[in-house]
UniProtKB/Swiss-Prot annotation:
It comes from the Archaea. The lineage of its organism: Archaea, Methanobacteriati, Methanobacteriota, Archaeoglobi, Archaeoglobales. InterPro entries: DUF47, PhoU-like_sf, Put_Phosphate_transp_reg. It comes from Archaeoglobus fulgidus (strain ATCC 49558 / DSM 4304 / JCM 9628 / NBRC 100126 / VC-16). NCBIfam families: TIGR00153 family protein. Belongs to the UPF0111 family. This is UPF0111 protein AF_2149.
Length: 211
């Protein structure tokens, strides 16, 4: 029965196109998270432009997804959830672009914080890979275990927040602008894991709806 329902949900041409496009969205998130790791680990400002291009491509994919859904892909009960997922994935790409742009405005990152930021960027990347696994699990199964792994990684980042903000108190910023850009950079870097977890929650809602 479950397999037959999934065939009805995912079997149409427009439905398959939307599924493939959402998969491309998540793959873009994976690629962009890897770029962010490179930016933070090696101060590789040259790839900031690649992050911006990924965001533009992601936005075009989101528009295409929404258009196909409103043109009749999926049964009405599922359309809003698929649209929500596309919007949430686009928000992750927006956040990653903001982080990359803010990095250009930061004069320096203390070594003790750079290590923390590298760890966060690496965890965000791992969560992005798991998000693709979670989306594929809508058809293949095993979603609960994947979402649990995402939750555990998100909690690891949450546990780092207090330590990071404590270290921030010891940094001597030259002025308000430098402080503001640095704080926004930290907030957004920490927020990526929350956004990925939110997208995972929407995938879970879709899984329940499909049943």
């Amino acid at each position: 029965m479950i397999d037959r329902i999934k065939k009805i949900v995912f079997g149409g041409e427009r439905e398959r196109e939307v599924v493939e496009l959402i998969g491309k969205q998540v793959e873009l998130i994976i690629d962009t998270c890897e770029l962010m790791k490179s930016i933070i680990e090696r101060s590789d400002e040259a790839v900031v432009g690649d992050v911006c291009e990924a965001e533009k491509l992601g936005d075009a994919i989101r528009r295409d997804i929404v258009l196909k859904i409103h043109s009749g892909a999926f049964i009405p009960a599922l359309r809003s959830d698929f649209c929500n997922l596309a919007e949430e994935l686009d928000e992750i790409l927006d956040e990653l672009e903001d982080i990359a742009m803010l990095y250009l405005l930061i004069d320096f990152i203390p070594d003790e914080l750079r290590d923390e930021f590298i760890r966060i960027a690496d965890t965000n990347s791992k969560m992005a890979y798991l998000l693709l696994d979670a989306f594929n699990a809508l058809e293949e199964g095993g979603l609960s275990d994947i979402l649990l792994k995402i939750k555990i990684l998100e909690e690891q980042i949450d546990s780092m927040k207090g330590r990071i903000y404590e270290k921030l108190k010891n940094i001597d910023f030259s002025g308000y602008a430098e402080w503001y850009y640095f704080i926004k950079f930290v907030e957004k870097l920490l927020n990526v894991s929350d956004l990925i977890e939110d997208a995972g929650d929407t995938i879970q809602v879709l899984s329940v709806s499909i049943r």
